[in-house]
Amino acid sequence: MAEKRKYSRKYCKYTEAKVDFIDYKDTALLKHALSERFKIMPRRLTGTSKKHQEMVEIAIKRARHVALIPYIVDRKEVVTNPFEGL
């Protein structure tokens, strides 16, 4: 019989760091919630809590609006580290 995989419990990085407010100008905090194509990653992949996920989404949308991070990247321009040029 096949062995069951033991998954490690995901935890919220923002709760562990005791972050009360996520600022849209702090791109270092936002990079954990973005994929390599600058898409917002869901909670089930990042492990963030519902409260912090909502704050992250709002901060990312504000950062996109003021052009701190791009809305989307072409497939040809995908880089391994999206925050290298920022």
Curated annotation (Swiss-Prot):
Give UniProt keywords alphabetically. Answer: Ribonucleoprotein, Ribosomal protein, RNA-binding, rRNA-binding
An example Gene Ontology biological process: translation
Cross-referenced InterPro entries: Ribosomal_bS18, Ribosomal_bS18_sf
GO CC aspect terms: cytosolic small ribosomal subunit
Please provide, alphabetically and separated by semicolons, the GO molecular function terms listed in this UniProt record: small ribosomal subunit rRNA binding; structural constituent of ribosome
Subunit (UniProt): Part of the 30S ribosomal subunit. Forms a tight heterodimer with protein bS6.
**Family the entry assigns:** Belongs to the bacterial ribosomal protein bS18 family.
PANTHER family under this entry? 30S RIBOSOMAL PROTEIN S18, SMALL RIBOSOMAL SUBUNIT PROTEIN BS18M
Biological role: Binds as a heterodimer with protein bS6 to the central domain of the 16S rRNA, where it helps stabilize the platform of the 30S subunit.
Which protein are we looking at? Answer: Small ribosomal subunit protein bS18
Q: What is the organism field in this record?
A: Campylobacter lari (strain RM2100 / D67 / ATCC BAA-1060)
